[in-house]
Swiss-Prot record:
It comes from the Archaea. It comes from Archaeoglobus fulgidus (strain ATCC 49558 / DSM 4304 / JCM 9628 / NBRC 100126 / VC-16). The lineage of its organism: Archaea, Methanobacteriati, Methanobacteriota, Archaeoglobi, Archaeoglobales. This is Probable deoxyhypusine synthase 2. The active site is at residue 259. Its EC number is 2.5.1.46.
Amino acid sequence: MARTGFQGRKLGEAFEIWTEMLREENITILMGLSGAMVPAGMRKIIAWLIRNRYIDVLVSTGANLFHDIHEAMGFRHFMGSEHVNDCKLFEEGIDRIHDVFAYEKEFNVIDYTLAEIISEMSGVMSSREFLEEIAGRLNVKDRNSIVIAAYESKVPIFSPAIADSSIGIAAALAKREVVIDTIRDVEELTEIVVNSEKTGVIYVGGGVPKNFIQQTEVVARLKGYDVRGHEYAIQITTDVPQFGGLSGCTFEEGVSWGKISGKAKKVQVNCDATIALPVLAHGLIGIRRQKYPIFNGL
C-alpha cells in the first residue's frame, strides 16, 4: 500500500514505520487510545497488540477501559443504527454510541461492581497502579480484555483523565480511601521515556492520551534530561489541523515543541481508526518482536 496514493499510501507508510519500530532492539512503543474504540469493536485488537508486545505502554481514555471491563465481565455492545428514535431508546434503557447500542442497566452493574472494588482499596496511587489493582481483583468471564492483557503481560496502562469516565463515576459512588495522583502519572510516564534509548508513538485519535505522551519530552527536558523527541510517530485521525485542536495537530507542529524529533520517521493517516487499525494489525501478524522493554522499576 505504501506505493499507492492518497491515504492508502499513508496507511502503508504507517505499517512500514511500525514494522521498523518492532525491529529496533532498544525502543519503547507508546500508544495513545481515544475515541469509542472498544464499543466499535477494536477491543480484541488492542489486547492482542499488548499480549504480543507490539506496544509497550498504553495511555487511554477511561471510557475505553470501562467499556473493556464491561465486556470482560460478560456483557456486550450490540450492532444498532444511528437512524433511530433516541427518546424511545432512552425509554427502553438503551445507550447509543453512533450505530452501537448497549444496555444502561448493564453499565450500572459495572458501575456498582467497580465501586465495590474501589471501596476495598486505599492509599495514594497513580492511575497505572489503580488500574492494576482493579484488574487483579476482577472476576472476569472474557480474558480477551485490554486491562487483563496488560495486567498479565506487565504492560503499564495510564488513564490521566480517568475521572472523565464511568470509572470516575464508580469512584464517586465508592466509599473510597484511595486517592488517584495523576501527577504521579506524569512522573512515571516521563521516567519510562527518560530510561528508554528510543521511543516511538502510535496515536489512535488524539485528545488527552496523545498530549499526555507528547508532553513527556517537555517534562524530561525541564528536569534537565537530554532528550531528542520521539523518534517514530504514527497517528490515525479524522481531524484536521486548521482549527487548532490537538487531535488534528500534525507531527511537524510537534517538532516545534521538541515533542517529536526533527529526524523522526512519522506519518499521519487521515482515516477512520476502525478501518485502519484492523488493516495494520493484520499486517503485523507475521512479525515477531525479539526484544522489548521490561519495567521492573514501576
